[in-house]
Amino acid sequence: MNPFQKNESKETLFSPVSIEEVPPRPPSPPKKPSPTICGSNYPLSIAFIVVNEFCERFSYYGMKAVLILYFLYFLHWNEDTSTSIYHAFSSLCYFTPILGAAIADSWLGKFKTIIYLSLVYVLGHVIKSLGALPILGGQVVHTVLSLIGLSLIALGTGGIKPCVAAFGGDQFEEKHAEERTRYFSVFYLSINAGSLISTFITPMLRGDVQCFGEDCYALAFGVPGLLMVIALVVFAMGSKIYNKPPPEGNIVAQVFKCIWFAISNRFKNRSGDIPKRQHWLDWAAEKYPKQLIMDVKALTRVLFLYIPLPMFWALLDQQGSRWTLQAIRMNRNLGFFVLQPDQMQVLNPLLVLIFIPLFDFVIYRLVSKCGINFSSLRKMAVGMILACLAFAVAAAVEIKINEMAPAQPGPQEVFLQVLNLADDEVKVTVVGNENNSLLIESIKSFQKTPHYSKLHLKTKSQDFHFHLKYHNLSLYTEHSVQEKNWYSLVIREDGNSISSMMVKDTESRTTNGMTTVRFVNTLHKDVNISLSTDTSLNVGEDYGVSAYRTVQRGEYPAVHCRTEDKNFSLNLGLLDFGAAYLFVITNNTNQGLQAWKIEDIPANKMSIAWQLPQYALVTAGEVMFSVTGLEFSYSQAPSSMKSVLQAAWLLTIAVGNIIVLVVAQFSGLVQWAEFILFSCLLLVICLIFSIMGYYYVPVKTEDMRGPADKHIPHIQGNMIKLETKKTKL
């Protein structure tokens, strides 16, 4: 039978052997009167619930905003592993609501479930914050604590997700349905507010505050943990005025039992003598009431359309992983503000708040006036296409970033520059092979070659002979180099003559957008340089070369330095994103001690503003896909199945994150190619979904109404009764 066709339930020819009588639910105790807000019809208890939700969402999204960078730079995992664990955590957060709903519906009730799992949530934050302390153990300890903390957080946030909104709805009397609807609007506003504010603030706590000489991940995790403590305390404060309905049974479990019984009963009755039934779910008629079977039939028709949906979430949820990793390799200076890479995620909730009224009141109405039938399924398909375009744009940005990156020497190649620290010009040539024409220009005093020159090696390592001409002197020197490296040949005065030294340079930009610096000291005394309150380095006398140090991007007009008998400061100027600098400390007789600044590797030039189009496209896709998808699903399934639909919707998000995990671990593609892969996969899925939607026959509301059935169990369930609100989950 075509799964898209309407399924009218008919009496079967096979007489049921037995029918299980489902006892009616005992009447609920009357709700005790609750204090109201300023004499209105709004219970005072909802204020505690709304504040709780704001703090909890701040806690979750704030912690998650910095998570990918924590994996990369604190736990020192590679990008693929960091992405995989990030999406494994996200997936777990969307699997655990099923467990939370089952606990609330069948055992503890909503209130106790929220309290107990919030305690688990807080414990997870505490363990996660401890794991981010550099002084607490080594790499293994940090990793173990982090994974335990994240597992508890996933259990806590997922477990309470299906309970909090529904518990708020329980505070209203049935006659105050209008006030309850407005409450849900405020509730969902608190979700978006918590997401928006936390995604902006916690990256600043991480990047703008230093702990133990590093980014302060402990603070970035600790503040969201504190907000979760506040959420728990505020929620518990309202305990005495809450209406706490008892557990009412789990409709999700009932659906699974009905489906399982139908399948098993069908296989038990495979004989050709037994009459066939119109629908495979009709085989549950021996045990389950007719209305429940009709509702499950309607549910399965919608769930069939859910099969392609995880691919969309696979793209959408990469904003916090792959797109953040892309942002760290871009120039984040906007002129009026310097962004942290993980702050770009704030665009999503911000644009959601802008796009929802724009689409509802402008775009959809204009399309309707043009006479175009823009159905829900078509909106979802367009949302998928917009997400495809977003990843195509992300791939183009990635390609441009790679083009701006410094070229790398290949096998049997090195890159070489010459720095002349002598008091007069020097001419340098390479002796004895095809490279002798590369360095033909004289290099003036305190100048360098305009760019790195490529030298070809005969083997993986080679000794090069250099001919130096200085005044009337002609000198020969020899230096050894290794393939695939960058070098600086430093010419310096040596009495009345000159000498040279070969210094190995950094090969590439830092992966985290930090600035790399090192120093050459031409003074006759050691110099101690304080780059920050907790970062200093010593440079040996007489052309000593320091190790590389990474520092935050910014202006450094007065870096404190000292020798054994003198304190002084150096103006290093702007140290920009991703650049590598060499500073030569010299004593100029006219201007005193100075630092000659040499940019070995240029800064990131690609502005982070180029990520705005991909964020705008994917958020527009989210508004068209997610909001419309929920509205469509709820219009096509009976009211008794709303909580089951929400469970299935959350599962599609969980599966989408698993797809990213698998691709990140096993694709082996460069980043721009991976973006193209996701874009193409979703395009194929969009085509399949469009075909499914073309043959889908929408169900009218009256078609889902069946005759009253005394065997229908009165089960409402405690999953969130999602209204068609525009929000994050």
UniProtKB/Swiss-Prot annotation:
Compartments, as annotated in UniProt: Apical cell membrane; Cytoplasmic vesicle, Phagosome membrane; Cell membrane
Signal peptide extent: none
Residues in compartment: Cytoplasmic: 1-57, 105-113, 161-183, 239-295, 365-380, 633-643, 696-729
Keywords assigned by UniProt, alphabetized: Cell membrane, Cytoplasmic vesicle, Glycoprotein, Immunity, Innate immunity, Membrane, Peptide transport, Phosphoprotein, Protein transport, Symport, Transmembrane, Transmembrane helix, Transport
Chief location category: membrane
Region described as Disordered: spans on this chain: 1-34
Catalytic reaction annotation: a dipeptide(out) + 2 H(+)(out) = a dipeptide(in) + 2 H(+)(in); N-acetyl-D-muramoyl-L-alanyl-D-isoglutamine(out) + 3 H(+)(out) = N-acetyl-D-muramoyl-L-alanyl-D-isoglutamine(in) + 3 H(+)(in); glycyl-L-leucine(out) + 2 H(+)(out) = glycyl-L-leucine(in) + 2 H(+)(in); glycyl-L-lysine(out) + 2 H(+)(out) = glycyl-L-lysine(in) + 2 H(+)(in)
Annotated spans, Extracellular domain (ECD): 402-611
GO terms of molecular function: dipeptide transmembrane transporter activity; peptide:proton symporter activity; tripeptide transmembrane transporter activity
Biological process per Gene Ontology, one example term: antibacterial innate immune response
Distribution of this protein across tissues and organs: Expressed in kidney. Not detected in intestine. Highly expressed in macrophages.
pH effects: Optimum pH is 6.
Stretches of the chain found on the membrane's Extracellular side: 79-83, 135-139, 205-217, 317-343, 402-611, 665-674
Membrane-spanning intervals of the chain: 58-78, 84-104, 114-134, 140-160, 184-204, 218-238, 296-316, 344-364, 381-401, 612-632, 644-664, 675-695
Compositionally biased residues, Pro residues: 24-33
Topology of the protein relative to the lipid bilayer: Multi-pass membrane protein
Glycosylation sites per record: N435, N472, N528, N567, N587
CDD domains attached to this UniProt entry: MFS_SLC15A1_2_like (cd17347)
Pfam families assigned: PTR2
Cell membrane recorded as keyword: yes
Matches recorded under NCBIfam families: 2A1704
Subunit comment: Interacts (via extracellular domain region) with trypsin.
Protein function: Proton-coupled amino-acid transporter that transports oligopeptides of 2 to 4 amino acids with a preference for dipeptides. Transports neutral and anionic dipeptides with a proton to peptide stoichiometry of 2:1 or 3:1. In kidney, involved in the absorption of circulating di- and tripeptides from the glomerular filtrate. Can also transport beta-lactam antibiotics, such as the aminocephalosporin cefadroxil, and other antiviral and anticancer drugs. Transports the dipeptide-like aminopeptidase inhibitor bestatin. Also able to transport carnosine.
Free-text domain note: The extracellular domain (ECD) region specifically binds trypsin.
Protein name: Solute carrier family 15 member 2
Organism: Homo sapiens (Human)
